[in-house]
Amino acid sequence: MNFKYIVAVSILIASAYARSEENDIQSLSQRDVLEEESLREIRGIGASILSAGKSALKGLAKGLAEHFANGKRTAEDHEVMKRLEAAIQSLSQRDVLEEESLREIRGIGASILSAGKSALKGLAKGLAEHFANGKRTAEEHEVMKRLEAVMRDLDSLDYPEEASEMETRSFNQEEIANLYTKKEKRILGPILGLVSNALGGLLG
């Protein structure tokens, strides 16, 4: 009987965590949409300015190179050309740095998601071990089936790019974001239902 209360408390904690995750996902999804729109506008403006600046510098460098090709360069002319070439190279490297920053941000997000999945898998594994050591009622068997389904869904999130590569290849970024939000809600839905049913059975 005491163990039932321990399991019930564990399930209550999991339920609260799942509800919190669902609320956080909804809030973050809305915030992400707004932030993504703002970032797209900022990147678009910045990219236009940067592209115009690079084009102007390249045009200037090309013009000077053609001019110097028809005559001898002074030491000062040579220094000017070196600085122009360095400026163009620096602007090209900035594009690479922006891509590296995006990879770092994605890595941090993946780590947070992995930690949440590990916590839920640990709870599911503990309940599975408990039920494996004794006879299961029909209700407990149903609980375990749902737990196993949830764990399979969590495992499928470990390789989202492989699982949905063909499905999302032609989607734009906003459609991809909506797809992953729906998938997370589809996984959290069974968790909430599972917790409610298990709690009702244990305390009933």
Swiss-Prot record:
It holds the Pfam family Bombinin. Expressed by the skin glands. It comes from the Eukaryota. It is found in: Secreted. The keyword DNA-binding does not apply. Residues 1-16 form the signal peptide. GO terms for cellular component: extracellular region. Keywords: Amidation, Amphibian defense peptide, Antibiotic, Antimicrobial, Cleavage on pair of basic residues, Repeat, Secreted, Signal. The modification Asparagine amide is found at N70, N133. GO terms for biological process: defense response to bacterium. Belongs to the bombinin family. Has antimicrobial activity, but no hemolytic activity. Preference on killing Gram-negative non-enteric bacteria. This is Bombinin-like peptides 1.
